[in-house]
Amino acid sequence: MALPDRKPMLQVEGIKKYFPIEKGLFRRVVGQVKAVDDVELEVRQGETLGLVGESGCGKTTLGRCIVRAIEPTEGRILLRLDGDRMTDLLQLGKQDLRAQRRHMQMIFQDPYSSLDPRKTILDIVAQPLRANRMGSSSEIEDRVRDLVELVGLNVESLIRYPHAFSGGQRQRIGIARALATNPRIVIADEPVSALDVSVQAQILNLLQDLQAEFDLTMLFIAHDLSVVEHVSDRVAVMYVGKIVETAETEELYLHPLHPYTEALLSAVSVPDPDIGQDHMILPGEAANPADLPSGCYFHPRCRYAEDRCRTETPAWTEARPGHFARCHFAGELELTGVDA
């Protein structure tokens, strides 16, 4: 369920992340990899925004730019820290940024490499609390106990090390760590992609329960639209560094406006053997972010492409109420969706 009346918690404006291509002994810059290219996003308070796209489209890079794990090349990242005041995180110095990091936390993709194998679960979950001096030792330990129980683990787990836990249990520990500081926004970077399907469902249900209980604001990054469908209020689709479509979840699944979204939706399995599915196979590979095509980046793979798609860059258009797409023919093409 979308929350149109909520104030934005996060606004990403014109974010770019270009990596230089260097060549020769003197490392001369000969080009750029446009990993994130002029992205605009808004995540409202208490909302889960799903960010989807193929591997290599720039989703994770964008998430890391938002928390300033890597520095963007250009743009603004505005986070609501106090009342109605939005703070541009890119204008903060190192000391101020460190003080504000507790307001933005990440849940990482790999539950095996994201936990320090030399530390107990108590120390892992307590680390952000200690780093931000959020209480005495006893208060921090009490907080960690509450968090561990909240994510479905026993308090006896606190003295154990990560190797003693399964992948799903490790991801629960990662979630507890992310929630420790009561962040304003959580960036969940493919939090279930490394897990078995049955465990995925458990973690998704946990995230939904936590979001409902604590009114969490979350950017949920994934490559699987069937996963995003169950946790997101709205969905943004990313292709080669650009957002190509965004809408409320049900609206986007039923009425896609961009051919790339239609192709992604065709891969979503329908749990009914009587319903035939026409899986759309996109020709070729995704565009090279170091050598992007002219016009619409998607035109070499698009079955609907016309001459203008090869020469003109499509504008960001609101073709239906609250439903935006970057396509010359948004709202004109009859694209196939699925029931959300």
Identify the role of each PLM range.
Residues R76-A99:
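ABC ATPase NBD Q-loop/coupling interface
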Residues Y161-F165, Q169:
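Conserved ABC ATPase signature
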Residues A2-P8, E22-R27, Q32, M86, ...:
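Short catalytic/signature loops enriched in Gly
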Residues V52-G53:
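The feature captures the beta-strand-to-loop junction immediately N-terminal to the Walker
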Residues D84-D88, S138-E156, L265:
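Conserved ABC ATPase "signature" region
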Residues R68, R184-I187, P191, L195, ...:
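P-loop NTP-binding/switch modules centered on Walker-like glycine-rich loops
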